[in-house]
């Protein structure tokens, strides 16, 4: 019995790992393409990721969707560390106001995007859409 539960647990973990990986690949590819074509790349991907995570939070719970889109896609799309390096580079260059402007703008837009996404998810939830996995 214990071996059977352990085997099922390993199988479930492997399925979860695959979902995260399947979401991470397109998220990373989108982030890479945004970095190639937009100067404010970190602002764009972080705000987009916040909006999408807000939407997911507003929808009915769906663990597989959270793994695929929330952790996989959004996790590989968004970046905290690169955003902080951008701010530190501005500070190092003596552009302190610009650094704090970048931080404030990203936080403000990110929270606003997450709130808008959550609001939209709640509205979609009210439509009583069928729960899908993922």
Curated annotation (Swiss-Prot):
Q: Report which reactions are catalysed by this protein.
A: fluoride(in) = fluoride(out)
Q: Which GO terms describe its cellular component?
A: plasma membrane
Residues engaged in binding Na(+): 75, 78
Q: What keywords does the record list, in alphabetical order?
A: Cell inner membrane, Cell membrane, Ion channel, Ion transport, Membrane, Metal-binding, Sodium, Transmembrane, Transmembrane helix, Transport
User: What is its biological role?
Assistant: Fluoride-specific ion channel. Important for reducing fluoride concentration in the cell, thus reducing its toxicity.
The listed locations are: Cell inner membrane
Any Pfam family from its record, for instance, is CRCB
Kindly list the biological process annotations in GO that this record carries: cellular detoxification of fluoride
Keyword Transmembrane helix part of the UniProt annotation: yes
**Activity control summary:** Na(+) is not transported, but it plays an essential structural role and its presence is essential for fluoride channel function.
UniProt name for this protein: Fluoride-specific ion channel FluC 2
* GO MF annotations in UniProt: fluoride channel activity; metal ion binding
**Superkingdom to which the source organism belongs:** Bacteria
């Amino acid at each position: 019995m214990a071996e059977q539960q352990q085997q099922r647990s390993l199988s479930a973990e492997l399925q979860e790992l695959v979902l995260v990986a399947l979401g991470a690949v397109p998220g990373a590819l989108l982030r890479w393409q945004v970095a190639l074509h937009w100067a404010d790349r970190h602002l764009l991907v972080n705000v987009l990721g916040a909006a999408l995570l807000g939407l997911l939070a507003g929808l009915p719970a769906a663990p597989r969707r959270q793994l695929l889109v929330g952790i996989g896609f959004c996790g590989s799309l968004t970046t905290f560390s690169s955003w902080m390096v951008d701010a530190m580079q501005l500070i190092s260059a003596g552009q302190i106001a610009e650094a704090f402007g970048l931080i404030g703008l990203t936080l403000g837009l990110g929270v606003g995007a997450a709130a808008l996404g959550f609001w939209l998810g709640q509205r979609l939830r009210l439509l009583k859409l069928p729960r899908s996995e993922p």
